[in-house]
Amino acid sequence: MTKEIILGIDLGTTNSCVAVIENKKPIVLENPEGKRTVPSVVSFNGDEVLVGDAAKRKQITNPNTVSSIKRLMGTKEKVTILNKEYTPEEISAKILSYIKDYAEKKLGTKINKAVITVPAYFDDAQRQATKNAGIIAGLTVERIINEPTAAALAYGIDKLDKEQKILVFDLGGGTFDVSVLDMADGTFEVLSTSGDNHLGGDDWDQVIINWLLKSIADEFNIDLSKNKMAMQRLKDAAEKAKIELSGVNTTTISLPFIAMDSSGQPINFEKELNRATFDNLTKNLIERLKKPVLDAMKESKLSLADIDQVLMVGGSTRMPAVQNLVKELTGKEPNHSLNPDEVVAIGAAIQGGVLAGEIDDILLLDVTPLTLSIETMGGVATPLIPRNTKIPVSKSQVFSTAADNQPSVDIRIVQGERSLAADNKLLGNFELSGIEPAPRGVPQIEIKFNIDANGIMSVNAKDLKTQKETSITIKDSQGLSQEEIDKMIKEAEENKEKDAKVKHERELVNRADSLINQLEQVVKTENVPQEQKDAFNKQIEELTNARDAQDYTKLEAEVKKVEDLLANAAKFAQQTQQQDPNNQKDDVTEATVTDDSTKK
């Protein structure tokens, strides 16, 4: 009998990752480009849909590119692309579908189950929206678990015999989460959670981008903030510089031909950025990391001295200033035994392994991220399930009527920490009718909350005298109907082959256009021999003809030929550079369209 495979997916704001259990050990699956993470970016170009690195390269230059869609999960907001509206679930489903497809190819089998992680602060609607995205992508979501909990699960897999208190410091590309967990005898219990949903590595990138824009404006008296091509290069260069400064004290950002000045001359910009300057520019971001840590510790009712391990999660935790802050706050050396980009997906895969019976002796106890209450007389939010209650859980309480002979009660369920219901988020409401006439306070109405292992809630109301009852499942109150989900699943399946063909052809044309541009630049260079210029002009003509004729077989052959030609040109340029003693330094250069540089 073939063993069941359940994918562990970290569906991140900036990057996503997938892992599975093989021989009782988690392994991270590489994507088709050989990378272990996938940018959570989707780009539309006519019939073509790009996901991941290919989409990220068009993030600024193509206005029909969507990133950080996770921020909209569980809301009614939609994105309009090429005159068509897409829900956040639909965009997320394209990322999940891409991950599912390459996982199936890697493992050589069909896969239809997954465990997906979400931030600890995701509410019920956001969790249900994540499940819906999985369904649209053709996945049964077996479990939704919190990202910090997944990270702790990954960390604890080899240390089940040690009782420990763990602080999980999770700084990703777009969100920041802190959790305090108790781990003992194979059981993980979340004691507290805190965080900032709008703080992540992207903010550090933006600081460098702003610094570069000002530096270029000061030196060349030009504003590049509206120049899409230039901004894409600045974004790529900023991310590279940030990553580089995690390992060296100084890096050089080189941006040749970044724009044209007022006289039509090309602008070549180069500037050093050292770690001290970078840390000074971003000190306000570092400061914002403190409060969530202190809040989580306060709520856990533990002191920092009680913490045994600080687990770093998310690529942004590689920054030395972040690590120094953690040491300063906790007095502990941060634990780097796990890859921060992959640890959440690994934890999700382990949970999948538990559900599939591949791994034993682990019990995952998750918690409710916010207090769940009902609205009572005077608009008060009366809590039934406090924040950080372990789930699954079921709790009930008896209420009564607010007026004499009241025939029905309206049950309004809210989520949040405020005392008044109006100040919290309304999750849903329903009515229990048919209450027998009686003075106020006499009827007994039992309200029962039930939350399953995915954090999805149902509420039941019963008249204890008549035994009449009614209930509601809080099911994506801000999102999609089942009909919409079914329609999207059908559309995704019907267009799968067509999408793949169109994607290949469009990528080929994009490569050809990029090569034509590169060849044209080389032809304009003075020190290139005329013979080589003639060869390049010939290739420009061949590429252009094949592209315009939509002869994709010929175009593919010509693209390969030109890439070989450019490789030889690169060798020539390298020899020229080696002859110049003034050009012997390590630079960080922006990515070109064809550059697949390492992403966080």
UniProtKB/Swiss-Prot annotation:
For this UniProt record, give its keywords in alphabetical order, as a comma-separated list: ATP-binding, Chaperone, Nucleotide-binding, Phosphoprotein, Stress response
Q: What job does the chain carry out?
A: Acts as a chaperone.
UniProt xrefs under InterPro entries? ATPase_NBD, Chaperone_DnaK, Heat_shock_70_CS, HSP70_peptide-bd_sf, Hsp_70_fam
Gene3D superfamilies from the UniProt entry: 3.30.420.40, Actin, Chain A, domain 4, Substrate Binding Domain Of DNAk, Chain A, domain 1
- Its recorded name reads Chaperone protein DnaK
Entry keyword ATP-binding: yes
Protein origin, superkingdom = Bacteria
Gene Ontology terms for molecular function? ATP binding; ATP-dependent protein folding chaperone; unfolded protein binding
Identify the species of origin.
Ureaplasma urealyticum serovar 10 (strain ATCC 33699 / Western)
Q: Where is this region: Disordered?
A: 572-600
Query: Which CDD domains does this entry report, sorted A to Z?
Result: ASKHA_NBD_HSP70_DnaK-like
Q: Which residue windows does the record flag with biased composition (Polar residues)? A: 591-600
Instruction: Summarize induction of expression.
Output: By stress conditions e.g. heat shock.
Phosphothreonine: residues carrying this PTM: T175
Q: Which PROSITE patterns match?
A: HSP70_1, HSP70_2
